[in-house]
Amino acid sequence: MFGFETCRPKLAGAFLGALLLSVPANALTEQYETPPEQDPATLLDGKELGPGYAVLSPVRGDGFLRIYQVQTDLGVEQIEGDGMLKLRLHEIQVLIALDSLKNDASFVDGLKQAAMKPVEFVESTVTDPVGTAKNTVSGVGRMFGRLTKGVEAAVSGKGGSPAELAKSITGQAKARRELAVDVGVDPYTFYRPLSEKLDETASVTTAGNWTVSAITSLLPGGIIVNAARQADNFRNLIVDSTPTELQERTSSVLRAVGVPEVTNAKLMGNPFYTASEKAAIAYQMQAMPGVKDLYLIAEKAADADSRDLAYFQLRRVVLMETYNSTVSPLGDIKLVSGIPVALRRDGIAAIVMPFDHVAWTQTVAQTFSAMHEGLGALPFPPTGVDFLITGDVTSMAAERIAAFGWEITGNYPIPKGPVF
């Protein structure tokens, strides 16, 4: 993941692999261009430098996504795509904000109290689960079921460690999820420094009267996320569900929208998505009940074999649902030259992609030429093509794409939410 020269961008390779079939000859012989190098100061509107990071110049691309080099305390990290960059910079911002809590004496005292809490409770839970549960849980219901499952798993060795079980029983695990969502980050983030800081910060809730609200009240302005009303249900799902429950609910939703069991299992087992991101894919698909053959979208998402490809597919699902609900209703999904393409109910094809900066490279030319021919080969070809992307296109790319008869819509924003 580190070092531009030694890491070949995977997205371009993935599209090329899917589109080596039926590539028109003119796409292989025409003139191409090299994606332009860009100044991060211009791209990021002066935000190329900030506390804890520096986006290095120049920014390169592969014809689909921009490729960034970001300097942090951990070294230089290669980040592929505008979405991934926005995600990482926000994670760094939250990490620094949480770290600033150490300047508050009462918070530091809370951390010390949490660190001194005895571990006998956990040990007795594992060695005598029934006896301890009688002393710590009253009544029945979902929480009791969680505790029983967690203790049984710990005793059998099939679950998490005693420390993880303790976090669940004491409420620290839920506090961590609530804290993460309140500051606009994924509780299951892959960014290890932030994950460790969330653990440390949430641990204070086991000491005294500390709550997540008390913690967030100490954070600098602009960090707390005010979720839109329509996002409340998803927020509650992430906060209130244990990892096991979230996985079960996500899989159930995928099943309900027609995703085959093989694809369901493959997506749920894909290590390049977080648990929250898998849930986001499932619930975005559920929000498109009138669209046929959505399983093709899930199949492509399940095939992601790298983090950048996974985040690209996640953003594409979000963008497609947004298009369906705000631009034009979609009718069904067709596999065109190996890529799922949406057909609108009015007969127009919607090629909806979270591309950053489209340049007319050989791979881009092959990709779009094959898609153009594939659309024309459908039993009922579309009456037009709406090519909608989140970024922009070079002059050459715009000219060549327009020659296909496609209508180009650029700089279409990803809606505000947990996906950047």
Where are the language model's segments positioned?
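Acidic-basic catalytic patches of nuclease active cores, encompassing PD-(D/E)XK
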Residues: 257-339
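Membrane-penetrating hydrophobic segments
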Residues: 107-126, 195-216
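Cationic, glycine-rich low-complexity segments
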Residues: 34-157
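N-terminal secretory signal peptides that target proteins for export/translocation
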Residues: 1-8
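Conserved catalytic cores of phosphodiester-cleaving nucleases, focusing on short active-site segments
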Residues: 317-379, 385-389
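Domain-level recognition of nuclease-like catalytic cores that cleave nucleotide substrates
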Residues: 390-420
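Membrane-engaging insertion elements
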Residues: 141-159, 228-267
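Bacterial N-terminal signal peptides
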Residues: 13-23
